[in-house]
Each structure stands twice: as structure tokens, then as C-alpha cells.
Amino acid sequence: MAELEFKRPYTEVTAMVIGVQPIGEYDRRVVLLTRERGKISAFAKGARRPNSQLVAATDLFVFGTFRLYAGRDSYTLVEASVQNYFPWFRMHIEASLEGQYFCEVLEYCTRENNDEAQLLLLLYQTLRALESGKFPARLVRSIFELKTVVIEGEMREPNPQKYLPAVMAALHHIERAPIAKLYSFSLDEPAQKELAELARRCMEFAFERHTFRSLEILEVMEV
């Protein structure tokens, strides 16, 4: 009698790596922000070995399709088809820190099995905007922060009398524009500073003054 063949319950997700942690001598634990299942963690066995097929696929910012084995209590990464490595960030320290901050924010505020597709798209478009060099990094950060707060449903409308008209116009654009058209405006220096302050206040309210380590490093570098 032929033996029955049992197929493992594989799952495929479109995702970006937003967190990486070494495990033991050769393995990695990755945090994936997925289109289908929200934020999930997966173990990548042997991913730190030089000849592993998972070495490059488990770096921060990697975007693509990930094939996972769903175990009883966790996922195991089996293979990945990478669509974008975002290699530019590995050559620019400050930009890399900005990207790490974006990932840290989303790792903090997203949940497993939530619909986080909009935040995944926001992260992808934000990295592309920063990579393009068309926008000041601080403006990109402010836009990302405000749109994240909007998507999370935590936006409180500011008093328009306290801000420049250009800042209020920018805020209304951020609130209403589809993510694909989010990064399509510029501001002069005074307006950028006001927008940054508004974004800071909104983030503090939305996330209860949570400390983001990568942001602390960025702020030290900006002094």
C-alpha cells in the first residue's frame, strides 16, 4: 500500500522586510509587513550562511513575494522572489536610518491578520520618494508620519490659525491623496519646519509618546 503524501501548508505573501534579528549562529528572524496577513514574523533557517539563498532576501527593506511554511506557532521562510532590494539605502547612512525609522514605526503600530495593505504601500512609496532625491528627507519623514496617523485613524485636525496656509494645504493633500500621488508637492523651508512640528505633535498623540530609537539617532545627527 502506497504511503500517503502529506503536503505542507505553504503560504505566499507579498511583503517587505521591516525587521531583522540574528538567531543563533546561522539563522535569522524577520518581521514582514504583508499585503495579505498584516505583520508576521518568520524564521529563516541558515539565512546567515554565505551560500544561503535567503541571505539577500532577509535584509531590511527587501520587497517581494515570500513563501512561508505555517507551523503550529510560527512561520518559517522557505524561499523568496525579490522585486526590489532598495540597494541605494545600503550606501547612504542617513537615508538608511530614515528607512529604519519608517520600518520601526510600522513594526510598532501594525498587527497580525490586520489589513495593513495601505501601510505597506505607504512604506514602499516612501522609500521610493527618498531614493529619488527629489524631496528633502525631513519633508518625506513628515509626510510619512502624517499619512501613517491618518491611516491609523488618529488624526486630530489642528487649529488652522496656528499654521501657514501652505502647511494646511499640504496637510489636506496628505489626508486626501491616494498614496501613489502622495509625494507630489514641495514646501519652502519655513513651511517644512511647521509641517515637521505638526507631524511630531500628531505622532506623539497617536502613539502616546512612544520612543523610536532610530528617530533619536536621526535627531542627534541633525543637531
Where are the regions that the model predicts?
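Non-catalytic alpha-helical scaffolds and adjoining flexible linkers that form interface surfaces
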Residues: 1-28, 33-223
